[in-house]
């Protein structure tokens, strides 16, 4: 292609002056054109997969390595979806579940990242989902209403003056359930024991024993640090006006932020000099027998997920 204006497949990127093109590739296996962009002002990174799939997908994600096991990434994932500047309702997520035409709607906390994915085949619905999620992550009501943190994270409860003080909270109770499952306990122990000197040694979802150690200010500081476009990854997929979506992202949100360095690097674990053994107890019910109720796991680190062929090979084996 020649001339001042280049047409990259489905997009005229020369008109999108707010973005820098980092790479483009035809993805023949999925009949798509792929683009990697960077928003010049904020530093946000965007992956665009343009094709004729009517099921449109959007997500924004942030690297959120936990510094402890208080579950702050998980609590923030819950709480940013409890109202925002543009959508000041108690629970926008529930409203979307009830009234949206979405084909997928969720928010997911991983050991090192938090993502907010949505999908819809309806153009107007898809745009609304994007708007609700972008406003939720960048302008949540958590700074105005401390009770959101207490409701979703943890708080003390006293049913009556003679009752004992108890701890309650959506994430707190969710993780109590997760930590009662032997399979979940083993999965967490594997990750923690293989990478003891990294953020993977901590529980991003929150350990019920440590969740009550999280303060409101620590929680807000985590959001201020990591929920910035400079630390974000945005993904757009499907049959849509990509130029329009990118302009909207720029004008409504990304251009309101300056590029700031965010230290969210995921450090590699130094290899062990010898094999290690870890033993941990887990809870069983009074009806269960301890006999034949033991789990054994042998684990090795074989590389990183950035090695595409190695990663795919082990996905197949799994």
What are these language model-derived features?
Residues 3-67, 86-124, 146, 159-165, ...:
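Non-catalytic beta-strand/loop surface segments
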Residues 70-82, 315:
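Active-site recognition of the HExxH zinc-binding catalytic motif
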Residues 122-124, 238-243:
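Helix N-cap motif at beta-to-alpha junctions
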Residues 126, 138-151:
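Short secondary-structure capping/junction motifs at helix and strand boundaries
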Residues 134-144, 252-261:
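A common structural junction motif
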Residues 306, 310-318:
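Short, intrinsically disordered, charge-balanced linker/junction segments flanking boundaries
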